[in-house]
Amino acid sequence: MILVFDVGNTNIVLGVYEQKDLIYHWRISTDKSRTVDEYAVIIKNLFDLNGLDMSRIKAVVMSSVVPPVMPTLESLARKYFDVEPLVIGPGVKTGMPIVYDNPREVGADRIVNAVAAYHKYGGPLVIVDFGTATTFCAISKRGEYLGGAIAPGVGISTEALFQRASKLPRIEIVKPKSIIAKNTVAGMQSGIYYGYTGQVDRIVTLMKQELGRDTRVIATGGLAELIQEDSQEIETVDPFLTLEGLLLIYERNSNQQP
């Protein structure tokens, strides 16, 4: 079995693969202050709750946009799984050319998503990832990573309204009953929901003009399904795209089966 880590600014998503099947997945908070042992306790509890034996893990793969937490997680793999983790970054074989001014600037999560999406759907395509930031990645018909756009995430924008406007409350991010709201909470929900849906569609429309009409649009991340409800551009929501990309990259760097 193989254990994969998608380390984001807010959450770490973990997945366990047996062969090519994702048999378990979990989401825990990203905490730079946690020790190796504290992360190990959390993961062991998750394994125990699902009847999994940690000794069956034969490989660990990680992608991260949070460099400070990586020494801890890499030590976790060595100490508790007795393996050297494969960390996505320069020197790791992805099979995807990166056509970018400085390829090292591209977040590991964006490359992992691109690898998985091109493998599953072909190109050209646009990948929208709803995380702490909302990212838009363009992939050519030949499977080249072309670049994209980065916008503040839905959660960041919502929190900014609460923090910077003294009379505005924290809100749940949901689809409002009507775009014309009758109270403050509904008004904020309307602005956030339809504002982000419009933002996504506009950016994707412009990308498709450059990539071509046959461009497919794939979304992933926490709010992908919600935004897809009113999006005119998102075709498919693929919630485990990043985890699948981690498995693919592992396979391209190893002859062993997970």
Curated annotation (Swiss-Prot):
Co-factor(s): NH4(+); K(+)
Superkingdom of origin organism: Bacteria
Any Pfam family matching the protein: Pan_kinase
SUPFAM superfamilies in the cross-refs: Actin-like ATPase domain
UniProt entry tagged with the keyword Acyltransferase: no
Residues involved in substrate binding: Y100, G107, A108, D109, R110, T184
Protein name: Type III pantothenate kinase
